[in-house]
């Protein structure tokens, strides 16, 4: 109830919460929604249509044009059931792995401190606020390795990461990171062994770009 006093609109996608793609949820404050017009037109969003005018509905159906993604909605419901079953375990597990990964990256930096053959600049929230994602820049012999190159080497080892601006180029400009960062995200299916695999791949980045 308290959140309703502060949020005009909120949305999320289920594909990042164990659900299917193509389905999400949008919360709108009632007064806020009445001042909005639909961006997608289709069946079910109108009250009346005249020859030269249209009258839209005033309820939430205004933003649900056409046939809904029925299978996606059913899948989203099952995702909610799964999240309720595991409760907070997924978040705590991901947070724990992020903490371990950050510490191991710091240890890696320390081991190469003298010759700087490999240096990792870490961008991550405090562990207490971290949800399992760690971003970083990679430097070999003092020169930055482009995040896309890092991701490519990781991919050869069957490690999937995100690389680039992460839909936040203005933030990257503010942080003076023109090439973006490599982002590692941990989830319920990851273990500490996966962290060790990432570290081994970083060693490969050093070997390839240190020649």
Go through each PLM region and give its residues:
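Pyridoxal 5′-phosphate
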Residues: 1-211
